[in-house]
Structures are given as structure tokens and as C-alpha cells.
Amino acid sequence: MEKATERQRILLRHLQPSSSSDASLSASACLSKDSAAYQYGDDVVIVAAQRTALCKAKRGSFKDTFPDELLASVLRALIEKTNVNPSEVGDIVVGTVLGPGSQRASECRMAAFYAGFPETVPIRTVNRQCSSGLQAVADVAAAIKAGFYDIGIGAGLESMTTNPRGWKGSVNPNVKKFEQAHNCLLPMGITSENVAHRFNVSREEQDQAAVDSHRKAASATASGKFKDEITPVKTKIVDPKTGDEKPITVSVDDGIRPNTTLSGLAKLKPVFKEDGTTTAGNSSQLSDGAGAVLLMRRNVAMQKGLPILGVFRTFSAVGVDPAIMGVGPAVAIPAAVKAAGLELNDVDLFEINEAFASQFVYCRNKLGLDAEKINVNGGAIAIGHPLGATGARCVATLLHEMKRRGKDCRFGVVSMCIGSGMGAAAVFERGGGVDELCDVRKV
């Protein structure tokens, strides 16, 4: 009773106007010493985040792997790394974009069974285009915060080999009467060209961003930085000429090109406009892959003695002009950071999805971000962009990098643009930065 009374007192204090501070309740949640949520173990933490390698669609190592097998591998990895009883998971939410809705929902349910989850654990899908994996993580965090359950998994899945892009069915002719609705149908490459043209992003700037992405991703791979986040997948690959099957274990992203140069990229022709600047070399790759994040209430993690990899702080989704959908992160990031009670300069690392170099460069410049803080291990241009899985992949990459950096890295942001004109961003805090009171075991 005394604890409940004290908690009410703290919450009421946040609701009362103060001459010394106008910080919101969500802002105070970022301050480990001044947070009702932290004090009572009610905030949402991440105890594991895993992904598969990302492989080139149609040509890569997962071209003969079923989507449900990709998802099962990362779901299984979360349980194996934490020894959490699968039956304790309140829900699994999977971000996925291209797979037919009812079929993909069934595939995800099948994947959970492959991974050892009992029939009592529910699963659902969510589709907010390229942010679907991040949306899944945010949905689970919100459900835990609301008290629907204490443990949940936010995941992402895409097989662009199995489910290639393309609009299916007819389009309502009335769409032509509404310019912004009509712009939702623009090819993503055209929106990239629109961003480059409207905001004067040069071809050289875009190509340089691509070179940097490959260079950093190649360095991260060579130094073993991705090993902690990548779950090896045992699968097969089929020779298209002979039909022979070969067993393989996939543990390395296969789209990274270490020898990418400005001169080499300059030779590539624009893909979407004859006089454009968007090429196959400065755009994200079509990829296959999956990722998954295990979240729980802090007091549950403490009771289980689990190390806390990160803390989920805030999430924001915003709308922008569909014709320049790539600007989404430039709007979503400030919204999420403000909700966390922070300034952009307080953020130590950013994972901004490189759908196209044009929009990546624009967002970086618009926000005035330090290039040394962004995509320090490369981005989607080098690693790949399996649409529904990208958010979960970025969360895994961010949190493992924050863990490596330790006390010098407290806050991180994941963000991406979204087809049809949106942006999403989430703020995370490094687990060790607010866990001085936790006596945790190593795994």
C-alpha cells in the first residue's frame, strides 16, 4: 500500500505544472534516477535482439528458403539465448509487407510452432510498409506498458524472393481525383528522384553515401561486429541448372560489396528517369531476412536475472507528402526524440534506413546530424532492405552496437521512411546505462 501511495505521488508530481521544468512524463522516463517507471520496474526493456543474415533476393543464400523457416530461426534464437519459457510469451507480433495477408499470418503461426512455442501463444502480423518490423516492436512495448502481458516478441519477416513487389488487382479510378492519393501509387524510385530534385541532393552525394555504406558494412563484417546479432540459419541452396540441393549455413550478409568505389558507381545509369540520379548502386537492395526482439517488463527481467540489452523509450509515426515519402525520418526523428524529453544532440547513435541514398542524405543534412553517429556499421544500401524485417534488423544492430560502446553511448534512434508517405522513429536507451541496481547474470 505504501509503495502504491508513493507511486501515485510521483505520478501526480509529473502532472502538476512546475516552474523549474516543463518536462513531460515520457521525458522523465529517460532519467534513470527520476522515473516512476524505472523505480518500480514498470518500464519496457529488451533482453535479446537477433536477426538472420540478409541475403540478395532471387540470387542470394536464402533464395530457396521458405519465409517461415527464416522467422522460426530468430524466434528460436531468442528462447535459446535467454532460457525464457516460451509459454510465458503473451504475444508475438510480426511486421511483414509483401506476403499475402492471410497466408503470411498462417506462415508466422507455423514458424512459432517450428520454434517450439506452444499453441497457447498467439501471433499476429502488422503492416506499416517499411517500418513494419519497428511497428511490431512498438506494438509489443505498448501492450506490455498497458498491462496486457509482461513478455512479448516484436519481429519482422520478408522474403522478396518468394513475394516480389507489385500491385495486385485493379485500382479505383477515383484515385486520380486526389493528387496525394494518386501519389501513393508512385514507384518508390520516382519518389527518390523527387527528393533529389526538390532538395538538390547531387548524384555524387548519393554515390558517396553508397560507398560509405559498403565500406562500413564490410569493416563491421570483417571485424566480427555482426556475430552477436546474427543467428546462423541452416538451410539449402538449389543449383538452378542441375536442381542439386546443397546444405549450407548462412551467417553473413551476402550483399555487401567491399570494393565499391565512386568511379564504379558513376558508371551506372539512372533506373527511374533518364536524367535522374537514382541508380541500382545508390539504392537499397531487395533482400530476404528476418529479425526478432524479446521485450518484457523490467521487474520481470530482474526476477529472471536477465541482462538488459536496452530500454524502449518512445515511438513516433508521422505522415508526409507521398511524392517525397523519403523525407519521413526528418519529421519522425524529432517527434520521437522530443517525446523522450531529449534533444537531437543527446542521441549517440542513429540507425536510419537507407531506402535510397537521396533520402538518406537529405534527412542527415536536414537534421544536421553528425555523420559519425549514423549507420556506423553500414545501412540498407550495403546490408539489404527486406521490407518487413528492416525495423527489427535495425533494432538488433543498434542495441548490440550500443552495448559494445558502453557508458559513452546512452541513447539511440531507429528510423525509416515509409511508402505512401510516412516516417517512423523510436528511441532506445542502452540497458547498462540505467541498470546499476540490477544484479544480472551473463549469458
Curated annotation (Swiss-Prot):
Signal peptide: none
Xref: CDD domains: thiolase (cd00751)
Enzyme Commission number(s): 2.3.1.16
UniProt cross-references to InterPro entries, sorted A to Z: Thiolase, Thiolase-like, Thiolase-like_sf_Thiolase, Thiolase_acyl_enz_int_AS, Thiolase_AS, Thiolase_C, Thiolase_CS, Thiolase_N
Major subcellular site: other
Tissues expressing this chain: Low levels in seedlings and leaves.
Keywords attached to this entry: Acyltransferase, Fatty acid biosynthesis, Fatty acid metabolism, Lipid biosynthesis, Lipid metabolism, Oxylipin biosynthesis, Peroxisome, Transferase, Transit peptide
Pathway in which the depicted protein is active: Lipid metabolism; fatty acid metabolism
One GO molecular-function entry: acetyl-CoA C-acyltransferase activity
Enzyme class, broadest EC rank: transferase
Subcellular location: Peroxisome
Catalysed reaction, written as an equation: an acyl-CoA + acetyl-CoA = a 3-oxoacyl-CoA + CoA
Boundaries of the annotated transit peptide in chain numbering: 1-30
GO biological process, one term: oxylipin biosynthetic process
GO cellular component, one term: plant-type vacuole
Active-site residues, record numbering mapped to chain: 130, 385, 417
Family membership noted in the UniProt record: Belongs to the thiolase-like superfamily. Thiolase family.
Function noted in UniProt: Involved in fatty-acid beta-oxidation prior to gluconeogenesis during germination and subsequent seedling growth. Implicated in jasmonic acid (JA) biosynthesis.
Subunit structure: Homodimer.
Protein name: 3-ketoacyl-CoA thiolase 1, peroxisomal
Organism: Arabidopsis thaliana
